[in-house]
Amino acid sequence: MSTGSTFKAIGKKVLSSCEMPLYSREVQSQIACQVNWIDDCLRSSRRQLSALDDLVKSQFVEMFGDGEWTSKTIGELATDIRYGTSKKATECGKYTYLRMNNLTDDGKLAYDDVKYIDLSGDELEKCQVVDGDLLFNRTNSREKVGKTAVFHGDTSMVIAGYIIRVRLGEEMRSDYLSVFMNLSTTKAMLRSIAKGAVHQANINSKELAAIKVPVAPIELQDRFLDFVARVDKLGFDCCREIVCCGVLFSSMSASLLCT
């Protein structure tokens, strides 16, 4: 239906010729009520999801933000800090290739848009991620630079050059550090130390290694992460409700248009 060589467009004539079911006003009112109900459910679930994220961060500040704990740099806590590979991704390959778009703004890993790559030997060892590795997005826009998430899983994956892999020693859990890195205060600090232009800001491995983190006892870190796990379960329920709302809306739309 669309035309045009530079960009696709639908003309007025084509649009005017489109047919659609014409329901009575009463039925239209019922449909509007159903759509509004789905929209309300969707908005509510998204608000709950955002509130749960805020809850985790506020709990972190409450437990560890009073200055009681000795601080150490990430460099002192890490056993290895390493850049990813600069090799180009492909549509096929042995290993999933994690890029900066796979790290979300809220500290998660998203796998809905991945590339692949083939590596071997020393290069694979340097760039491969294992369960518990902390991933840090070193180059991005100034607003997004410093995105941080933890890799969990046993599937072999490789990181791109815009990501720094951090492996921690026994003093700190990577998920604890990830929550710290995703605090609004930490993100503001990351923006302040990032070098470069607005659309291409950078934080190198030395600058990352110099960041100080409160080092609470492992037992207390684990207690906090137990709390995070319970909140994550609630978050999973919210995500499931969001998906269900989307499916319900699509199903209802298809049913109405096919009538």
Language-model features, listed with the residues they occupy:
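A generic structural signal for short beta-strands and their flanking turns/coil linkers
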Residues: 94, 113, 160-162
